[in-house]
Amino acid sequence: MTVPCIPRGPVMADIAAFRLTEEEKQRLLDPAVGGVILFRRNFQNIAQLKELTAEIKALRTPELIIAVDHEGGRVQRFIEGFTRLPAMNVLGQIWDKDGASAAETAARQIGWVLATELSACGIDLSFTPVLDLDWGNCAVIGNRSFHRNPEAVARLALALQKGLEKGGMKSCGKHFPGHGFVEGDSHLVLPEDGRSLSELEAADLAPFRIMSREGMAAVMPAHVVYPQVDTKPAGFSEIWLKQILRRDIGFKGVIFSDDLTMEGACGAGGIKERARISFEAGCDIVLVCNRPDLVDELRDDFRIPDNPALAQRWQYMANTLGSAAAQAVIQTADFQAAQAFVAGLASPQDTAGGVKVGEAF
């Protein structure tokens, strides 16, 4: 069978279960679509996951990019057969107790294990690290954050990024310019952060600035309003994305929207309007999760935005290790020692409980 050549479009969609339905295959063949995000509902075991990713990648060329939220703690979509990853605040605790060097070493090991295990299963990208500061206000962020100190967050995220790269994956910092100060969960409401730009610059923006300088591949903006800067949520704001992130910070990588079905995005109108505003604000790729009907509505008479960099940016997010090479790494003694080390961080301080993030129920 001839595999159709279809350039990757600017929409990342999802699927319902363990295998593709015929309807989903047709949806993923649409030129509007360029990637697939997987969730816990798509995982039964490692063998099934490998079959699913191979099925997705066999649909078209260039292959669809496959992503997942696999941060550690309560945001780890695949459990059985994978190393249990600690929540990132465990690294902050190591930073405070044992010093920066010990915490950075642990972060590199976590990134390596995280990325290599996913790479072996045909996954291109995990949406990590979380660069939000832990102000103690936001339950949906909470222990997903490394620390409250911007320097600690930046250094631990950079160490994690080095581990991810060793395992074949790029990094995606989120949620620009910072979701940690607000109380609301943008999956459920549209939060507001009333601080000034200078206050944000002094704290929350620092990790994004440092990581941009150090090769962070992608950014995901927050569905949060910062009214002293713009009345629009950051993901819909040209001020935040084109002026502050691109021009002032100098970020040159990929901008993924957060899920456009989240409540924090719904005030912008229907799905076509949300996507249009996201693209105009500066997003390269939009996520539409848990609502295949909205993906279909969006792709109906869809006009692909003029973005000459899109193909290159998509390709930049593709896995660089490959499943066979990753599987070979997993068999080595060094990697198995890293797995044991990482599992040891998670076991006594397991933080999988708490607010659930981004799953459909």
From Swiss-Prot:
Keywords: Cell cycle, Cell division, Cell shape, Cell wall biogenesis/degradation, Cytoplasm, Glycosidase, Hydrolase, Peptidoglycan synthesis. One of its GO terms (cellular component) is cytoplasm. One of its GO terms (molecular function) is beta-N-acetylhexosaminidase activity. It is found in: Cytoplasm. Gene3D superfamilies: Glycoside hydrolase, family 3, N-terminal domain. The active site is at H187 (proton donor/acceptor), D258 (nucleophile). It comes from the Bacteria. Its EC number is 3.2.1.52. It holds the Pfam family Glyco_hydro_3. Plays a role in peptidoglycan recycling by cleaving the terminal beta-1,4-linked N-acetylglucosamine (GlcNAc) from peptide-linked peptidoglycan fragments, giving rise to free GlcNAc, anhydro-N-acetylmuramic acid and anhydro-N-acetylmuramic acid-linked peptides. HAMAP family: NagZ (MF_00364). This is Beta-hexosaminidase. The lineage of its organism: Bacteria, Pseudomonadati, Pseudomonadota, Betaproteobacteria, Neisseriales. The gene is nagZ.
